[in-house]
Amino acid sequence: MEVQLGLGRVYPRPPSKTYRGAFQNLFQSVREVIQNPGPRHPEAASAAPPGASLQQQQQQQQETSPRQQQQQQQGEDGSPQAHRRGPTGYLVLDEEQQPSQPQSAPECHPERGCVPEPGAAVAAGKGLPQQLPAPPDEDDSAAPSTLSLLGPTFPGLSSCSTDLKDILSEASTMQLLQQQQQEAVSEGSSSGRAREASGAPTSSKDNYLGGTSTISDSAKELCKAVSVSMGLGVEALEHLSPGEQLRGDCMYAPVLGVPPAVRPTPCAPLAECKGSLLDDSAGKSTEDTAEYSPFKGGYTKGLEGESLGCSGSAAAGSSGTLELPSTLSLYKSGALDEAAAYQSRDYYNFPLALAGPPPPPPPPHPHARIKLENPLDYGSAWAAAAAQCRYGDLASLHGAGAAGPGSGSPSAAASSSWHTLFTAEEGQLYGPCGGGGGGGGGGGGGAGEAGAVAPYGYTRPPQGLAGQEGDFTAPDVWYPGGMVSRVPYPSPTCVKSEMGPWMDSYSGPYGDMRLETARDHVLPIDYYFPPQKTCLICGDEASGCHYGALTCGSCKVFFKRAAEGKQKYLCASRNDCTIDKFRRKNCPSCRLRKCYEAGMTLGARKLKKLGNLKLQEEGEASSTTSPTEETAQKLTVSHIEGYECQPIFLNVLEAIEPGVVCAGHDNNQPDSFAALLSSLNELGERQLVHVVKWAKALPGFRNLHVDDQMAVIQYSWMGLMVFAMGWRSFTNVNSRMLYFAPDLVFNEYRMHKSRMYSQCVRMRHLSQEFGWLQITPQEFLCMKALLLFSIIPVDGLKNQKFFDELRMNYIKELDRIIACKRKNPTSCSRRFYQLTKLLDSVQPIARELHQFTFDLLIKSHMVSVDFPEMMAEIISVQVPKILSGKVKPIYFHTQ
């Protein structure tokens, strides 16, 4: 789509007419004067005025036909052309005399079936005859664009400088430009004949600039004035010499229409590229180009407007004249490659006055025309990354598709760096894209059948991901999301071709490869990333498995001394010190606790020795021992293992037990229902965080499925908090009050004030049971761990079998703790019965509290009780499952 810059906004190109401003001719003429100072003769042939319509050009050609022939004859004879007086709407400048060649009648293309007039060419992508620029006479309204400082849309600027300022100012309107254009068409022929009859040889340039001696200086001053009025910088025009070459990205840069003597060198291959594009496009039929006309037409037509006669194109090469572009040079084509362009300067952010009213909305098939501010220097990383872009295509960035959507020959593809960001799927948004032989958007002409072979060794197949080896960039640049960045193949720059069969079932051009959906097809993560051997305590490099955990030598020695010694370590902080390689010696208490959490035990080495001894003895005495002796030996070993494992398990439970958590309640404020319940909710939020950490540190808990871990914690958190609060009340206040936290203790008054007196009474009774049964700390720790595995969904967990085994192991540990201090089996059974009954009594209390908290959450906005986010989520999602019977506790005894 060709976008024209308007005053303060951007207008799209109308479907039938292109509005072009006069600043192109202004800047072009000023540029030529700056680069070629001194008196020159006007050029013999030039382009028709860009603002004139097709009918006006035909009428002007018919009126001036005799004089054009006379001019051509004079050019053939070699007679010098004198200065002619141009129309009042032009400011004629002296230029270098160019020999004019006779214009040959163009031959009509046999496939087009049209008979164009002399000077007419077929517009690319449309098949419509377009008037070629004809050499005008001195009295023609369409003065040569190379001799004019302003186009025909400004007919009165040569006689009055005030009009120039008015039109160039932002206050000028499009209506004034249209009126002046109509006046120029009507008055051009009569004024030209009058000047020819009078024989006045003087040019309006002399009247305006004051003589030929000051042409260069006046042009520079005028150019500076125009730049200042339009908000442009004028530093680019300072210290310009005749042979100085301007930069290609500047608006005053010389283009292909400039004579070869002053044309910059980088533009020579560009002219050949554009000329080859015109040669290929001129030979194609209308039917071939109709498919991708919205893309090809905008690009090729713009090249025809520039009249690239220097490369021998079919459209403009027959005349043999150098003609200036009629489009704005600010719209840089995709083939430009300027290495010396300023990357930080922007010459495009300024308003341009357009000759015409604001055009209508864009047509359904706009011409694709991309304005690029920087050179097209995209490396291989961009070409590779474009594979993921919804508009990108690797085949269209390089290789056969590099010549542009309208290119149909390999030569054009090789000489151009055109690329497109439009794919065939976006036809409804950006115009119909080429398909088949013509092929737009990455399927260019000659390589459309066999597929474009890019320098990267990759061609995009019709379906899925092709496994073609070649010079790819780094795989982590273009791999789809969810795929690991390292590949286990010999060459890191190739794609595994075996991926194709199982990737066809996924959606998307490359397959929706995610670890969740393709877990069965992707190797384990340890295959790509070898496990790091680091110490589980401090993170230093581990030296081996010591005392049941992978640790370094320093932590190994520390644990041996700390566990065997009788010294008690206390943390000066809150039992949450950071233990790493540099700070592991700061807090021995937290370091020892972390050792227990990692599973380090002094009995691990003894158990290993006992196990090896057991296997050795069984192997030696397998043939000599009797069944009775063998059974007794197994019982002895199991009895030793039981006594050895008992302190290990208790040491772990003691090390991971959470500390005291405060509720943050303000006891200076009067007690109220909202304040007490809000403090309880805040305390529950803080304790829930500690419960999660404690549960993850329990032996065997991490072996559960992740979903089972979350479910077990979310269902049992209320019972765990009630059981722990009862123990704190028993140890701190002898079960006379409810010791929720050091700053939140409930007495009788607060129990009534909180409107949960019945629940508080039952919790106080539970706390008193600890005293009546004389529960030991070891029994409490084991019972609390067993309480975590005492409530599950009715439908079961995802790994119910492992959950049952883990629960049974904790029951056995509780039985071992009971049997540790009691030698009488009868007393052990009685004690086990008492402790399990106490565990069963926790479940009804937890259910009542679930119902209370759920009702409170529903009407919390009415009673002004605050619920933390995590508490509100668990109560609203998980508690209804318990209340509805979908989740039930596991009882030891029949209720």
From Swiss-Prot:
- Per the annotation, which location comes first and is thus the protein's main one? nucleus
A GO term from the CC aspect:
nucleus
List the residue(s) that the UniProt entry marks as the site Interaction with coactivator LXXL and FXXFY motifs. Answer: 696
Where does this protein have compositionally biased stretches of type Polar residues? 201-211
Under Gene Ontology molecular function, one entry of this record is:
nuclear receptor activity
Record key words, sorted: Cytoplasm, DNA-binding, Isopeptide bond, Lipid-binding, Lipoprotein, Metal-binding, Nucleus, Palmitate, Phosphoprotein, Receptor, Steroid-binding, Transcription, Transcription regulation, Ubl conjugation, Zinc, Zinc-finger
> What is the name of the protein in this document?
Androgen receptor
Q: Which organism is it from?
A: Macaca fascicularis (Crab-eating macaque)
